[in-house]
Curated annotation (Swiss-Prot):
PROSITE patterns: GATASE_TYPE_2, SIS. Transmembrane segments: none annotated. Signal peptide: none annotated. Its EC number is 2.6.1.16. It comes from Helicobacter pylori (strain J99 / ATCC 700824). It is found in: Cytoplasm. Keywords: Aminotransferase, Cytoplasm, Glutamine amidotransferase, Repeat, Transferase. Residues 2-218 form the Glutamine amidotransferase type-2 domain. Its main location: cytoplasm. Residues 276-416, 449-587 form the SIS domain. The gene is glmS. NCBIfam families: glmS, PRK00331.1. This is Glutamine--fructose-6-phosphate aminotransferase [isomerizing]. The keyword Repeat applies. HAMAP family: GlmS.
């Protein structure tokens, strides 16, 4: 959610910090700030809104001498978006930035106020600064005082702090929130994402859970688990928008390539392979898939595939529910955690709970150095590449594709799928990749059609079987970027309540599969049409009662239809949001990586 950058060294700090924050900008934020300590002079700058506002504030500033510095992009959790609530938070002698949530901040704040501390913001983070100031009254050693202050915090945090008494060091603390430190020719760098550090450092350390410490240029070498950056391939790809109007449009168009990357080395001569030892999958009798948001919709879709193809019981559970609902597990259960970032707080905590129960665990994520990838028994990378837009497109499609492949691979290992069926599914996967190539005629038709769907009191997205989770995803995509109300439903559920909302001002986006339950879904569409809903049908089969019809190319399988419909719904959401003049890359109130509960 929030982004952290830190730097110790001689180089000009403003450009380093702003460049780092720019790299983290796609995660979502509502304010930004930085602090520099050099020659006993502490300067703090904070602005609300876009990073460009902070850049303007610093237009005539340069920080050339040796010093320590921190920077932050904030996504509001405690306190409204404002300059006062932006990070860094500071006192006369220190400044700090924080990602996460301090759960006991209210009680700590009350204690500190009773001792005479005055607060300038509504945030939980400012409590940490005053807590350290208070602790230093009784503990003279700065590091010990910092450690003692951190020990009083309950919640999740990644913290960077600078202090006038330690002009060559940064202090850090990490618990359930990512923080990485690296060293390069220009000095020591901190960030909440390795992508920020990759071009700048030769060595790096992913800080251990519950670690607290002090870093300078000299003592970096004393850290545990130092890794060499040259051992890892970070492609220097062009992440500019190019000729596209926004990153979301670019990423929709990139899905054909990202799906090919997802299948690279996993699909050879119509046989499926996976980076999981077959012995690990022996005796698996049940699968639990745990995730949030679009990843949850990918999980729901895969339940149909695991049950149908691998002939194994599967269930998808929201990570936030799994943690507290006391679901019963069994010794032969396989737990699959799914998260684009690999740092989603609820999914990460659910994964830890599954590990504590002794379950076999697999993580599906897009980040090889994420916390989830480090604590799972196995990790499968979706290889979707960077998504700059907050709304998930490439990641969702790659998650579904990889889960589909995993269902076939598992069936292969368990002996529940024939060699012929494996070949059929492999061919269907390749056809589905081709289906994700955007045809200009399709995009142009959807662009023209979108102007009809700007006003009304809401949208129903409906589908059956595997197209029900896809309907949920289509509705979420529209909600996220257009701010229009949309709900996804299993088609047959219309009669159980939702149909009461139907009138001429309600739009229905109907996913009509030729290969699965065509007649049943057609009947559900007719029920809505009879009550005057405006019907937009996505199908290869023409339906006369449709008010609008997005005709898809013929598909050889229902999963190929799935990907064709997914692409069309993404384009429809994009064009509606563009007509409404919304910032589709940075929707309001949303963050790319949700690292707090």
């Amino acid at each position: 959610m929030c982004g952290i950058v830190g730097y110790i060294g001689d180089s000009e700090k403003k450009s380093i910090l702003l460049e780092g924050l720019k790299e983290l900008e796609y995660r979502g934020y509502d304010s930004a700030g930085l602090a520099v300590l050099s020659a006993n002079r502490l300067e703090v700058f904070k602005t609300q809104g876009k990073l460009e506002n902070l850049r303007t504030e610093l237009k005539n500033k340069e920080f050339l001498n040796f010093g320590v510095s921190i920077a932050h992009t904030r996504w509001a959790t405690h306190g409204k978006p404002s300059s006062a609530n932006a990070h860094p938070h500071f006192t006369e002698n220190l400044a700090l930035v924080h990602n996460g949530i301090i759960e006991n901040y209210a009680s700590l704040k009350k204690e500190l106020e009773n001792k005479g501390h005055a607060f300038l913001s509504q945030t939980d983070t400012e409590v940490i600064a005053h807590l350290l100031e208070e602790t230093l009254k009784s503990e003279g050693d700065l590091l010990k005082a910092f450690e003692k202050s951190i020990s009083l915090l309950k919640g999740s945090y990644a913290i960077l702090m600078l202090h006038k008494r330690a002009k060559e060091s940064l202090f850090y603390a990490k618990s359930s929130s990512p923080l990485i430190v690296g060293k390069g020719k220009e000095g020591v760098f901190f960030a909440s994402s390795l992508s920020v550090l990759a071009p700048k450092v030769d060595q790096f350390v992913i800080l251990e859970e519950n670690s607290v410490g002090q870093i300078s240029l000299e003592n970096f070498k004393d850290l545990n688990n130092i890794e060499n950056m040259k051992d890892y391939a970070f492609e220097n790809k062009d992440y500019s928008k190019g000729n596209f109007r926004n990153y979301l449009e670019k990423e929709i168009y990139e899905q054909h390539s990202s799906l090919l990357e997802c299948l690279e080395g996993r699909l050879e001569a119509l046989s499926v392979y996976c980076e999981i030892d077959p012995e690990f999958l022996e005796n698996v009798s049940e699968i639990t898939l745990c995730s949030c948001g679009s990843s949850y919709h990918a999980s729901l879709a895969s339940v149909y595939l695991f049950e149908r193809l691998a002939k194994i019981r599967a269930r998808a559970i929201l990570a936030s529910e799994y943690r507290y609902a006391h679901f019963k597990s069994n010794p032969n259960e396989l737990f699959i955690a799914i998260s684009q970032s690999g740092e989603t707080a609820d999914t990460l905590e659910a994964l830890k709970l599954a590990k504590a129960q002794g379950l076999k665990t697999i993580s599906l994520c897009n980040a090889p150095f994420s916390m989830m990838s480090r604590i799972s028994d196995h990790t499968l990378l979706i290889r979707a590449g960077v998504e700059r837009s907050v709304a998930s497109t490439k990641a969702f499609s790659s998650q579904v594709m990889l889960l589909w492949l995993l269902s076939v691979y598992l069936g292969k290992q368990l002996g529940t799928i024939s060699k012929e069926e494996e070949r059929i599914q492999a061919k269907n996967m390749l056809n589905s990749v081709k289906a994700m190539k955007v045809e200009p005629k399709l995009h142009e038709k959807i662009k023209r059609l979108s102007k009809r769907y700007l006003h009304g009191h809401g949208f129903f997205y409906i589908g059956r079987d595997v197209f029900y989770p896809l309907a949920l995803e289509g509705a979420l995509k529209l909600k996220e970027i257009s701010y229009l109300h949309a709900e996804g439903y299993a088609s047959a559920e219309m009669k159980h309540g939702p149909i009461a909302l139907v009138d001429s001002n309600l739009f229905t986006i109907a996913l009509l599969s030729k290969h699965l339950l065509f007649d049943k879904t057609k009947s559900n569409i007719e029920e809505l049409s009879a009550r005057d809903s405006t019907i937009c049908v996505l199908s290869s089969e023409i339906l006369e009662i449709a008010d609008d019809f997005i005709q898809l190319e013929e598909s050889e399988s229902y999963m190929e239809e799935f990907f064709r419909m997914n692409l069309a719904m993404q384009l429809l959401a994009l064009e509606i949001a563009m007509r409404l003049n919304h910032d589709v890359d940075h929707p309001r109130n949303l963050a790319k990586s949700v690292t707090v509960e």
